[in-house]
Every structure is written in C-alpha cells, then in structure tokens.
Regions:
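Aromatic- and glycine-rich beta-strand/loop motifs that create alpha-glucan
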Residues: 1-26
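Internal/C-terminal transmembrane anchor helices
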Residues: 295-301, 334-376
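Membrane-interface alpha-helices at helix entry/exit sites of multi-pass transporters
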Residues: 111-123
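Secretory targeting signals
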Residues: 67, 71-74, 122-182, 186, ...
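Terminal transmembrane helical anchor/hairpin motif
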Residues: 4, 40-69, 196-271, 275-288, ...
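Central hydrophobic cores of alpha-helical transmembrane segments
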Residues: 185-198, 326, 349-361
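Function-determining sites in protein domains
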Residues: 350-357, 367-727
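Long, hydrophobic alpha-helical segments
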Residues: 72-101, 120
Length: 727
C-alpha cells in the first residue's frame, strides 16, 4: 500500500511539473478537433440548406465526410499526435539533462524502473485524456446535429485506438533518444535522426543504384519504403490504408508496430537503468554509443554529399563525386565531434574513426562505380525462375492502369501494375530478351566508361536505331523477386516481342480489363469521330461484352496492334476513372455487339469525309528560326510570305493545303493519326518533321473537326515532297 501511495504521489508531482504540456495538449485537441468539428457541422447544415434540393447525394457525401473527420484519416489529429508525442517524449525526462536534478530524483528511495514507469505513463495520459474528452465533445456535437450513427461511433473508436498506438511509437522513440543523450539540443537532434534515418538510408541506396547501375529498376516498393521507414511516414501511410480498407494487411502492420513498441519500451527502460548519473550535461550518455552513432551518420551523409555534387554537375563527372564525398565526410565528421565534445578544437578528434569512415565510403563507392558484384550483368538461372513479368515501353500508351483491390489509391505506374499482375509461365522469349538487354549493357560499358544511362549510343549506326525499355521481374522458386530494366533495339528483337505479346499470360497483366468483374464497371460507351453512344446494359450484358472483347483481344497480334488503325474507342466508366480500349476492324464479335445496340462499329473516316489536308515541313520552320537569330526572316530571304489574293489564302514556303479529291485520295492512305502513333511510337516509323492537319466533316451541316496526322516513313507522295520542299 505504501508503495502504491508513493507511486501515485510521485505521479501527481510529475503532473504538476508538466502542466504546460497538459494545457498544450488540451488546447490543441480543442481547437483542431472539437472546434473544427463544430465548424464542419455548420458547413454541412449550410450545404444541405442550399444544395439539398438539387443534389440527392449530398447526405451521403456529408456522411462520408463525417467518417473521414472522426476516423483515422483526420490530418489534424495526426499532426496533434505527432507534436504531442515529440513534446512529451523530450520533456518528460528533462531532469536527465541536469546533474542536480538527476541527483535529486535518483535519491528518492524508488527503483529506477518505477521512476521510468511514472514518467512514461504520465506522458501517455497527457495525450489520452484530452483526446478522450474532445472525442466525447465531438460525439455530442454530431449527435445534436443528427450525424451520429453507429458507423461514426465505431470509426471514432477505431481512430482513438489507432492514434494511441502510433503515439506510443513516436513517443517511445523520442524517449530512447533522450536516454542516449545528455543535452536537450542533442536529444532533439537525436530524435530527428531516429525519425528520418530509415528513409534517408533507403533514399541514398535508391539514388546510388539509379545513378550507377544501368539495369536498376525502381518500383513501388522503393517509394513505399522511403515513406514507411520513417515512423511518421508509416503513421500517415497506415491511416490512409485503414480508410481504404486493406483488411488483413493493416492487422499485420498494427501487430508489428505493437511488437516494436514493446521492444522499444524495454530498451528505453534498460537504458534508464544503466544510464550513469554523470551523463547529465554531456552530448552522449554512453561512451560505447559514440563511435557507433558517429559512423552510422558520417558514412551515409558522405555518400549523400558525393552523389549530390555529382548530380549537380551536368557532366556527372566522377571528380565531383570524389569532391563531394571528401567534403561531406570532413564536414559531417567535424560537426559530430564538435557536438560530442562541445569544443571546436576537437573537430578532427579520433582521426582513426575518420580514416575508417573514409575507407568504408571508398569501398561502397567502388562497389557501385565498378559494379564489383556484377549487378548489371546478373540474370538468374532459368531453372531457378518460376515466372517472369515484363513491361514493354512505348506499346499501347493509351492504356490506363488502376488496381481495384487498392480502392481510391489504386492508380499506379503502368510498369508497376504489369509486373505485379503478370506471370508468364513460358519464360523462354522473355528470358532471351533479357539476355539481349545484358549484351546491350556490356556493349555500352565497353565503349563508354563514363556512361550515365542506358540511352548512350554505342556507335554512329545506333543513332538511327529505335530502342524500347524492357522492364522485368523474375520470380524465383523461393518467391524472391528480382527487378531489372534494359534498353533494347527494336529491329533485332521484334520476333521475340511478337511471341511475348501473343502469350495470354502477358495480356492478362498488360491489359487491366482481364482483372475486372462486371460490377467494377458502371457503364460502357463507344465513340468515334462521328458518334458517341452510351449503352444501357445490365450486369449480365456487361459481363458478356467484356468476355467477348477479351476473347478477341486474346487473338490480337503485335502486328495487328501497331499496323491496324482502330475503328472506335470503348469507354469503361468506373467509380474512379474512365478506361479506354480500342476496337479494331478484326474484332468482328465486338463490332456485331455494338451494331446490335445502335452503334456503327465499322464507320471510319473516308476520303469523302475530308474537307482539306494541310501539310507543313518543320525543317523550313527551323531554318526560318535560325535565320531570325541573325536578323533575317525566311520570308525575307525567299521573298515568299503568307498573303491573300482576292480573299484566297496562299500557302507560305514549306506548307501546302490540299482540297482536291485526287490529292486527298493519294495522301490519306499514307498517313496515320497522331494519337495512334504516339500510343505505339517506338514500333511505328513516321516522318516526324512533317505535320499533317486533316479537317474532317462530321455531319451534313458543315460541322468539322481537325486531327493531327503523320506520314508513314517513306510513303510521302512525290507531289507533296515537291510542294513543301522536303529534303
């Protein structure tokens, strides 16, 4: 009983010393939670009053907003939690920074573990009690205004528990920093290091791999790790995932955080027990931690300095890397020693650690610079590869990627989606392409030792060679994933690409439509230049149509995709995005389905629909621009300029407008739409220096539209070449 009374008495005394923290916490929650809640409710009432009769979904929208505000995704509560955790963590054990106060506290006849528990528990209560009070106030406000339902109540409780867990994580990390240091300023710096160190290391690693390895592929996991290796970033990321309903993933993450919190509490308690009283006022509380922390900071900071100077220099010269390494090494080492000793004269104290850091930095840089582990030329043994996933750059650029499993944040980079959802069980062609990519890497490295990226050309013949990016994920038998990116010439690998493209396993990962359910799609419409029609389909018809389209997509070859122009575009509307898919003339069942529902799937632009074709030679424009640098316009030098004669526009030099049917009939088969070209630009050859603008009549009432086109390579009619002075 005496022990219990002493515990409570010490707890009350500690609370008296921390009244300012309590006031700050209460004020923060009241202003940024309760008051903001009242403001939001007032805004909701105004919206209902002004928009209720016009918007039938306004109440549902307000309900979702209330859930978001009271739930884990409330950004203001997250900020309060972070600030309160840092403040309470740093201020709770403030007496450890004063020798007199340390002697006073440690003279109390109470075990250190109990002193630690008192201060730790008070820091938790300073957060929990104001949060609970203001959560109840928010419940009352919402209830009075008829926004309080069971879902809102449970969402608030979920947020309460979730925020407490991450408060404990951030709070305990700050306490560990205090235990390791003996000065408030150093404690603050140490806390910042602990919060950011993981993200910093992952970022440095990613930057070096990206800078030095030609085949390095940065995927979603890297970006995610940079965020989540910081407890602050992990907090925000997990809050978003809860709102998006990740289920079992969240449970596993929360369990891992709880285990980490328990380990950190045990570690902090151990440090408090072992912390010498004379550590007060010193930079570091434990001598053994000084070199460990010093090396853990100096080495990555030096690497960051080197890559920073190298990146700033346009030449990416290795000399700037070396300069940056040395500069950052000396400066960071000196600053840390000054902090350790509180003496500028000891900036280079412990020269052996400085030399050791320099050696470690040099070894790491040499590993990257000379690829000592053969990262760029490594390829798993084919017998060890379970499946391969690939993403081919410059192909089907119109495809939009979205993962319905990830709710509102499902948007993703196209290669990430394909690599995550594709499993090619017959890896032969994909594996052969990877080997060709490695040979390309070796060729580049043998010619250009100071390479920066895979886009350096090997020889003069390669200047006119078209390359595509080839991203690969090897999934090994042990479930390990290996990612690589290669740049490969089109001409010598086209046959292998055709084999990959026709593989159903490839298409299932390349086209997201294969992963859809009919209920993912709200509506389906179809459009061309002449018509835009939205279909009224039930779930069975939507499912039937999607299956029809996928079946025809299965049989579509790479040759078809890049050489046959589509006749129409399908638009699949979901809750989040609209997705476009092309209808090709060979998709007979798809076209029949569209025709049966009143859309002409065979209607294309014919020469009879074309009002005029305007052609411009960009080379002439470039010559004109070059002349203007010297004060001479092209019109002056050739005495030709755009003018009108009796109201008729005269084409200037390098341009020509064709309106006669004979010319149009000869030009139109030789051009392709600009958007179709850009969708597959790597695999289609066009005359890029010539712009073609086609004016198309879209009805019988003189309404027209204009579209950009390109001439196919080597198919420009002779009379056009003469008319625009094309060389």
């Amino acid at each position: 009983m005496t022990s219990k009374n002493l515990f409570l008495k010490l707890q009350r005394e500690d609370m008296k010393r921390r009244v300012w923290s309590i006031a700050l916490s209460m004020l923060g929650f009241f202003l940024l939670f309760t008051v903001v809640c009242a403001m939001e409710v007032s805004n909701y009432a105004y919206r209902i009053k002004t928009m209720g009769e016009f918007d039938s979904n306004i109440k549902e929208w307000i309900h979702n907003q209330v859930i978001r505000f009271i739930g884990p995704a409330n950004e203001l509560v997250i900020v309060i939690t972070m600030v309160c955790a840092v403040v309470c963590g740093l201020s709770g054990f403030f007496y450890l920074h004063s020798k007199k106060k340390v002697d006073l506290f440690h003279s109390i006849p109470v075990r250190r573990e109990k002193l630690f528990a008192i201060t730790y528990l008070n820091g938790l209560l300073i957060y929990i009690v104001p949060y609970m009070i203001n959560l109840l106030l928010c419940y009352i406000i919402l209830g009075i205004n008829n926004h309080m339902v069971m879902e809102v109540f449970l969402s608030g409780l979920t947020a309460f528990g979730f925020n407490i867990i991450y408060y404990l994580l951030i709070y305990t990390i700050a306490i560990v920093a205090v235990m390791l240091t003996g000065n408030i300023v150093v404690s603050f710096l140490g806390t910042a290091v602990f919060y950011l160190y993981g993200s910093f290391i992952v970022g440095i690693k990613d930057t070096y791999f990206n800078e030095f390895f030609m085949t390095y592929l940065s995927v979603n996991d890297t970006e995610r790790m940079i965020v989540e290796m910081s407890p602050l970033g992990n907090y925000v990321s997990t809050a978003d995932k809860i709102i998006e309903g990740y289920g079992s993933d969240i449970i596993g993450r929360i369990i891992a955080v709880i285990v980490l919190i328990i380990a950190l509490i045990a570690f902090a308690t151990f440090l408090y027990k072992k912390r010498p009283s004379e550590a007060a006022g010193k930079a570091m509380a434990f001598e053994i931690s000084r070199p460990i922390i010093k090396l853990a900071l100096v080495i990555p900071i030096s690497l960051a300095g080197g890559i920073l100077f190298m990146s700033i220099s346009n030449s990416h010269d290795i000399a700037w890397l070396i300069f940056g390494l040395i500069f950052a090494l000396v400066i960071s080492y000196g600053i840390i020693e000054i902090i350790y000793n509180f003496d500028v004269r000891k900036a280079l104290h412990g020269v052996y650690y400085l030399l050791g850091s320099a050696v470690a930095v040099g070894v790491i840089v040499c590993i990257f610079q000379f690829d000592l582990f053969n990262y760029d030329t490594y390829i798993p043994k084919q017998n060890d590869v379970k499946t391969i996933s690939v993403a081919i750059g410059g192909l089907d650029g119109y495809i939009r990627y979205y993962d319905f499993d990830y709710s509102s944040s499902g948007g993703t980079y196209n290669h990430n989606y394909q690599l995550d959802h594709m499993e090619i069980s017959n890896p032969e062609p994909a594996y052969e392409l990877a080997k060709i990519g490695i040979e390309q890497v070796k060729s580049i490295k043998s010619v250009n030792k100071n390479y920066k990226s895979m886009y350096n050309v090997v020889d003069t013949d390669a200047i006119n060679t078209k390359f595509y990016t080839y991203k690969v994920k090897y999934t090994l038998d042990n479930e390990r994933n290996i990612y690589r990116e290669y740049t490969i010439p089109v001409d010598s690998t086209y046959d292998l690409l055709k084999d990959i493209y026709i593989d159903l396993d490839y298409k299932k990962g390349h086209y997201p439509i294969y992963m859809w359910n009919a209920d993912d799609v709200n509506s389906i419409s179809c459009s061309n230049l002449f018509e835009d029609k939205k279909f009224s389909l039930n779930d069975f018809e939507k499912k039937q149509f999607i299956e029809i389209y996928k079946e025809e997509l299965n049989n579509n070859s790479l040759d078809d995709t890049i050489s046959i122009q589509p006749t129409a575009t399908l638009i699949f509307e979901t809750n989040n995005y609209d997705f476009n898919y092309y209808v090709y003339p060979t998709f007979t069942n798809t076209i029949n389905f569209l025709n049966d529902r009143g859309f002409d799937g065979t209607r294309v632009v014919g020469t009879e629909d074309i009002k005029e074709i305007f052609v411009e030679n960009f080379n002439i424009r470039l010559e004109d621009a070059e002349g203007e640098k010297h004060g001479i316009t092209y019109a002056e030098s050739t005495q030709v300029a755009t003018k009108e004669v009796k109201g008729i526009a005269i084409d200037r030099e390098g341009t020509k407008t064709y309106t006669d049917p004979a010319s149009i009939m000869e030009i139109y088969p030789a051009i392709i739409p600009g958007d179709f070209y850009w969708d597959n630009s790597v695999f289609i050859d066009v005359e890029n220096s010539i712009e073609v603008i086609v004016t198309i009549n879209i009805d019988d009432y003189e309404n027209f539209i204009t579209r950009s086109y390109y001439f196919k390579a080597n198919e420009i009619p002779e009379f056009v070449i003469r008319d625009i002075n094309y060389k």
